[in-house]
Design a protein with these regions (language model features):
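Domain-length cofactor-binding catalytic modules of enzymes
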Residues: 2-26, 33-40, 46-54, 61-64, ...
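A generic, well-ordered mixed alpha/beta core segment in the N-terminal half of proteins
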Residues: 66-130
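Acidic active-site catalytic centers that drive phospho-/nucleotidyl reactions
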Residues: 42-43, 70
Length: 422
């Protein structure tokens, strides 16, 4: 474990890059965050705008960049009983034709959603319409077609098996382009607020109310024009990437973030239902007799207790959670210990030891393929080398670092893996 002098920070690993430490220090150098209790998870690595593995309560301020662009991303786990050998190639073909991935969306080349999934589709569509930032979204019609689709990069569909022979369908994906757009909209707003835009809006609203009350509505347009002309931006007190929201803009962000979380939840469950329905129709899976219930672990969000988890999951006492390791080694199923010193959190994965660029340049396709022997996958290719097992921290390192926050109750190993390129 590492600490950073003069701050209430604990980093639950010794394996952390210098630039990740600098990202943490940059945030804590901002006066309003200096005294915050920050806990960094063992899968820590540098990220875009904020370190991955960040947890903390930032009070009445929100930095959209910390939550990031894949709001509500998470992993959904659907246990099932396998009653007949699964045709893995047929499953792969089903996914390719029914679950668009990467930059794909539902269009003429993908199979239409069956009627039984229309309730989920309609709810997802209403979520997009209900966003407070809806007017700033681009291409809403395409957003409607993203439900039931898988992201690229580290997102995946897996079928895993445990030591007693129970199977698990594991879905890792998030809010897709919807979450990215919402994150970008609010980060731009946060930057504007640091330049004085929020104060300008307050003056403008007060002016509108006063002019209307005085019966001077016809003069408003010119008065507002002059107000904007006289506005001078102030020098921002924080770096652009750490700009924050307060007050009603914070409330707007929280509202839309939670809607994106719900959208991502629907997305994962729809993918899981599509696949389990296919497995049942093939006579390969029995869902009804499986005593284990589905569950999910979400990262990239702000909890109701105001804890931000960026690349981290909740691990409250008794909470079931999943920590994926890599494409070869599978995942840990755990029960949270509710350790408040960890902000009741756990890592959302093993954590990268290579950047995507490093992985592409240093890992050979042959080594990648050898590492995946024994697992059925048609996804081992040049475009997914950045997700090979060697790009991630060793499983034993993560297992050794999490004993104070979770109890490991099961290890599930992949027998099938599907992954799309970024």
């Amino acid at each position: 474990m590492k600490t950073i002098e003069n701050y209430n920070i604990k980093i639950y690993t010794d394996n952390i890059e210098d630039n990740a430490v600098e990202q943490i220090k940059e945030l804590m150098s901002i006066d309003v965050f200096r005294k915050c209790k920050i806990r960094i998870m063992p899968d820590v690595h540098a990220g875009a705008g904020c370190v991955i593995g960040f947890t903390g309560n930032l009070g009445e301020r929100i930095i959209p960049n910390i939550v990031g662009v894949d709001i509500g991303c998470g992993i959904y786990v659907r246990p099932f009983v396998c009653i007949k050998d699964i045709d893995w190639h047929a499953l792969n073909e089903f996914i390719l034709h029914n679950i668009p991935s990467g930059h794909g969306h539902r269009n003429a080349t993908s199979a239409p959603l069956p009627d039984k999934y229309m309730d989920g589709y309609r709810e997802a569509k209403e979520i997009v319409k209900a966003l407070r930032c809806n007017r700033d979204l681009k291409d809403n019609k395409r957003l409607y077609k993203l439900i039931g689709t898988l992201g690229g990069g580290n997102h995946f569909i897996e079928v895993d098996r445990d030591e007693v022979g129970l199977y698990y369908l594991v879905i890792h994906t998030g809010s897709r382009n919807l979450g990215k757009q919402v994150a970008d909209i609010y980060q731009k707003l946060a930057i504007k607020c640091q330049l004085g835009w929020a104060e300008l809006m307050e003056v403008k609203e007060q002016m509108i109310a006063e002019y209307k009350a005085a019966g001077r509505k016809s003069e408003l347009r010119e008065a507002i024009r002059q107000l904007h002309c006289s506005f001078k931006t102030k020098k921002p007190a924080v770096p652009q990437e750490l700009s924050y929201l307060e007050g009603r803009y914070r409330d707007d962000y929280l509202n839309d973030m939670r809607l994106c979380q719900r959208w991502a939840e629907i997305n994962r469950q729809m993918i899981a239902e599509l696949i389990t329905d296919w497995l049942v129709a093939q006579g390969s899976a029995d869902i009804s007799t499986c005593e284990e219930k589905p569950f999910e672990s979400v990262h990239n969000y702000i909890g109701l207790d105001n804890i931000i988890r960026k690349g981290a999951i909740a691990a409250y006492e008794g909470q079931k959670c999943i920590i994926p390791l890599n494409m070869r080694d599978g995942s840990l199923i755990c029960i949270g210990r509710g350790n408040t010193d960890w902000n009741c959190s756990a890592p959302h994965g093993a954590g990268r030891i290579m950047s995507r660029k490093q992985a592409f340049n240093s890992i050979s396709l042959d080594d990648y393929a050898k590492s995946m022997q024994g697992i059925y996958t048609e996804s081992v290719n040049e475009e997914t080398k950045d997700e090979s097992p060697m790009a991630y921290k060793p499983k034993d390192e993560i297992i050794g670092n999490i004993k104070d926050t979770v109890n490991i109750v099961n290890v599930i190993k992949p027998v099938y893996n599907f992954k799309a390129a970024e």
